[in-house]
């Protein structure tokens, strides 16, 4: 299914920096960093990918489709000299995009994801969210309590809670399309198994994450010969949230070279 228009929040004026969130995330997750980057001459487009946030829901959810969504967004907004940044699933979208359409991109930043395949490891989260019956669990407090009984991770629970909204006056709902994401979970973990991008590239990994290992570096350089790889030791997978200042500094240092 073709997406007609992705939702985005646009901050500031200047050269375009497009940010793509990760699985179960949305553009709001990047508001703090967007405001920081606008202070350095960048117009930040924080985009909701398909099946997330305020963007349309669809049954399809793979990286070719999400890359095509991004292409339409760039062309519709008449953006030039674009820098792309993506976290986790968003990083896979960016990698797919730049090997297919390198002429539309000046540089890319990938946050805590490698081009390799990742085994399915989100099922506990999916099961916990599927257990919510919005016809009965009709308050944020009740939903948080139910999730807390199944997930021993307050940070993850609060991350999910940000995607709750009032579908009607009486009923809450997830902004993401949980059923489509579960059906396509293998696609979300798929490897980038073709192509290369020879433009400026930065990979930022969390030292406590385990998503980018030393043995992944060869694959990164194979697809992205100009890549720089930096590790923020104190951060886990949500590098931008767990080490905000260090992360912003690494990104800004890279952007200043462009």
Across the structure, where does each feature detected by a protein language model lie?
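Catalytic histidine-centered segment of alpha/beta-hydrolase-like enzymes
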Residues: 235-248
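Conserved alpha/beta-hydrolase catalytic His-Asp/Glu region
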Residues: 120, 135-191
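The conserved beta1-alpha1 loop
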Residues: 20-22, 205
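Active-site loop/oxyanion-hole signature of alpha/beta-hydrolase fold enzymes
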Residues: 31-34, 39, 43-85, 89, ...
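Conserved serine/cysteine hydrolase catalytic core
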Residues: 169-223, 228-231
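Flexible "cap/lid" loop of the alpha/beta hydrolase fold
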Residues: 96-99, 106-137
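Alpha/beta-hydrolase fold catalytic core
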Residues: 1-18, 39-42, 79-80, 224-225, ...
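Active-site glycine-rich loops that stabilize anionic/oxyanionic intermediates
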Residues: 14, 22-25, 88
């Amino acid at each position: 299914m073709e997406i007609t228009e992705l939702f985005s929040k646009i901050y500031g004026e200047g050269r375009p920096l497009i940010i793509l969130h990760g699985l179960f995330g949305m553009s709001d997750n990047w508001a703090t960093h967007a405001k920081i980057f606008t202070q350095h001459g960048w117009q930040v487009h924080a985009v909701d990918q398909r099946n997330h946030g305020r963007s349309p829901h669809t049954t399809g959810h793979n990286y070719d489709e999400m890359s095509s969504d991004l292409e339409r967004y760039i062309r519709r907004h008449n953006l030039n000299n674009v820098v792309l940044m993506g976290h986790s699933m968003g990083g896979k979208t960016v990698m797919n995009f730049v090997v297919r359409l390198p002429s539309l991109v000046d540089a890319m930043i990938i946050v805590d994801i490698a081009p390799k395949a990742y085994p399915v490891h989100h099922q506990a989260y999916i099961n916990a969210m599927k257990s919510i019956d919005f016809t009965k669990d009709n308050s944020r407090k009740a939903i948080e309590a139910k999730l807390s009984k199944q997930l021993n991770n307050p940070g993850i629970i609060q991350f999910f809670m940000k995607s709750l909204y009032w579908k009607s006056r009486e009923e809450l709902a997830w902004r993401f399309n949980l059923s489509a994401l579960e059906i396509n979970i293998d696609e979300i973990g798929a490897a980038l198994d073709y192509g290369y991008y020879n433009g400026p590239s930065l990979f930022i990994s969390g030292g406590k994450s385990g998503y980018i290992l030393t043995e992944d570096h060869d694959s990164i350089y194979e697809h992205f010969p100009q890549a720089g790889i930096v590790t923020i030791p104190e951060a886990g997978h949500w590098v931008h949230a767990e080490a905000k200042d260090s992360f912003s500094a690494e990104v800004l240092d890279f952007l200043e070279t462009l």
